[in-house]
Curated annotation (Swiss-Prot):
The gene is purH. Disulfide bonds: none annotated. One of its GO terms (molecular function) is IMP cyclohydrolase activity. This is Bifunctional purine biosynthesis protein PurH. Pfam families: AICARFT_IMPCHas, MGS. SUPFAM superfamilies: Cytidine deaminase-like, Methylglyoxal synthase-like. Gene3D superfamilies: 3.40.140.20, Methylglyoxal synthase-like domain (3.40.50.1380). Belongs to the PurH family. Residues 1-148 form the MGS-like domain. Its EC number is 2.1.2.3, 3.5.4.10. The IMP cyclohydrolase activity resides in the N-terminal region.
Length: 529
């Protein structure tokens, strides 16, 4: 039999009150004595529950505006006391055992995320007594249950009912792990916040705070184990951030199909992030982390049809992302035309899911609609270190563009230029994208020489019989030589959009003028490695 411990006395002190009333009522109904502090105690008393204030229990009042509430031997002795070993000393000092501690911590992350949060506000939201109780209870998990997540309330009551008011050691150990994870994440947030302020605090920077802390503490939660990683000899798992607000592959719900692989997740992320760039109904098809077809139209069906035409060969076994609900007609077009690994969309109709269900290997994910892009950090692991940078959310508006050629772009060329510029951001460098009438017609990705990416994009368009004449070309970075412009002109490109900034910009612009090409500078680069 598991080492059960009956729950006779519980201390409840929570910042997040979700579910606490019902949980406290369930504990009380099972004969558990309730201790509590401050606002939690008042809330429970208002609901008619018999609750003892910790200050009454210890005989010592809360003080210093609530900074000192639970830091008392009667509290921590009751939590840390080892049953069967410390009984005599506990009895001598009138310390009653506390069998369960229910605590979640001051909302530090929410506080510092608020605009205008001062250092004083942040400091006052650093919990002291809470983490101390959490760690004490987790340390003594052989005798005490520590509860830090409201999502565990129902399971705890269910287990108590199955074990005559007791919890097993396995459960207490699992709860202790969650508790240490909780306090580690909490302390990491505080360390990151203060670490980012070190230069400014010591007068080493004119900025209010640095973007990157002195020590970077990261906390991710394992969502799933993978069968293997990028290759079959590599073990892997998928970890996600807690409380992600933006629709993403990490928050998406899989509504159909077998488990996602490591490569599925990476490619789905690439497809979804690309399709988010567009306001019109859009489709992005990705293969090996690169878009192989992108289009916008009046419907996602037409957008898919046009994206597929860019490169049907590469689309086989690809990932398809939409920025509108997946409907039955589009689902049918996909299933009848190609093999697809993953389809991701904000939502999917029931009829669409019935159609995709006919193909058991097709994974369908719904991620919800996204209102806005959320700034964050990108990470790249190198041997012995971690490169950290802001997410590339850089965008350019039509008003920010600079036409540097003699010829001005037509309205259609300008639309196509802005369209393929958005796509180029998600193509591996060196990236070249040809587009015409809101669809990609050729994509050159990942070449060591930019001119070869331009040539490949032209070859891809020719292979599919797509008309390049009058198209726009986007380059993720500047052209170091005029050869890329010459290659584009040779296949009929009439407009080029690029960041500019080369020491040979004059030569490159002159090449555009020679060929009658309109050239636009964005003054923003989008390397992707």
């Amino acid at each position: 039999m598991q080492q059960r411990r009956p729950v006779r006395r519980a201390l409840l002190s929570v910042s997040d009150k979700a579910g606490i009333i019902e949980f406290a009522q369930a504990l009380s109904a099972r004969g558990v004595e309730l201790l509590s502090t401050g606002g939690t105690a008042r809330l429970l008393a208002e609901k008619g529950l018999a609750v003892t204030e910790v200050s009454d229990y210890t005989g010592f009042p809360e003080m210093m505006d609530g900074r000192v509430k639970t830091l008392h031997p009667k509290v921590h002795g009751g939590i840390l006391g080892r049953r069967g070993q410390d009984d005599a000393i506990m009895e001598q000092h009138h310390i009653a055992p506390i069998d369960m501690v229910v605590v979640n911590l001051y909302p530090f992350a929410e506080t510092v995320a608020r605009e205008g949060c001062s250092l004083e506000d942040a400091v006052e939201n650093i919990d002291i007594g809470g983490p101390t109780m959490v760690r004490s209870a987790a340390k003594n998990h052989k005798d005490v249950a520590i509860v830090v997540k409201s999502s565990d309330y129902d399971a705890i009551i269910k287990e108590m009912d199955a074990n005559e008011g007791s919890l097993t050691l396995d459960t207490r150990f699992d709860l202790a792990i969650k508790a240490f994870e909780h306090t580690a994440a909490y302390d990491s947030m505080i360390a990151n916040y203060f670490g980012s302020m070190v230069p400014a605090y010591h007068g080493e920077s004119k900025e209010a705070a640095g973007r990157f802390p002195r020590t970077l503490n990261l906390n991710f939660i394992k969502k799933q184990d993978m069968r293997y990683g990028e290759n079959s000899h590599q073990q892997a798992a998928f970890y996600i951030e807690e409380n992600v607000k933006e629709a993403s592959v990490a928050t998406a719900q899989q509504v159909q199909g077998k488990a996602l692989s490591y490569n599925n997740i990476a490619d789905t992320d690439a497809a979804l992030e690309c399709v988010k760039e567009f306001n019109e109904p859009a489709c992005v098809i990705v293969k090996h982390a690169n878009p192989c077809g992108v289009a916008v139209s009046t419907t996602i069906l037409d957008a898919y049809d046009r994206a597929y035409k860019t490169d049907p060969t590469s689309a086989f076994g690809g990932i398809i992302a939409f920025n509108r609900e997946l409907d039955a007609e589009t689902a049918q077009a996909i299933i009848s035309r190609q093999f697809v690994e993953v389809i991701i969309a904000p939502s999917a109709t029931e009829d669409a899911l019935k159609i995709t269900a006919a193909k058991q290997n097709v994974r369908v994910l719904t991620c919800g609609q996204w209102a806005q892009r959320v700034p964050g950090l990108d990470f790249k692991r190198v041997n012995g270190g971690l490169l950290v940078q802001d997410r590339d959310l850089g965008m350019v508006s039509e008003a920010e563009l600079r036409v540097v050629s003699k010829r001005q772009p037509t309205e259609q060329e300008l639309r196509d230029a802005l369209f393929c510029w958005k796509v180029a951001k998600f193509v591996k460098s060196n990236a070249i994208v040809y587009a015409k009438e809101n669809m990609t017609i050729g994509i050159g990705a990942g070449q060591m020489s930019r001119v070869y990416s331009a040539k490949i994009a032209g070859i891809k368009a020719a292979d599919e019989g797509l008309e390049v004449k009058g198209s726009a070309m986007a380059s993720d970075a500047f052209f170091p030589f005029r050869d890329g412009i010459d290659a584009a002109a040779a296949v009929g490109v009439s407009c080029v959009i690029q960041p500019g900034g080369s020491i040979r910009d004059d030569e490159v612009i002159a090449a555009a003028d020679e060929h009658g090409i309109a050239m636009i500078f964005t003054d923003m680069r989008h390397f992707r490695h």
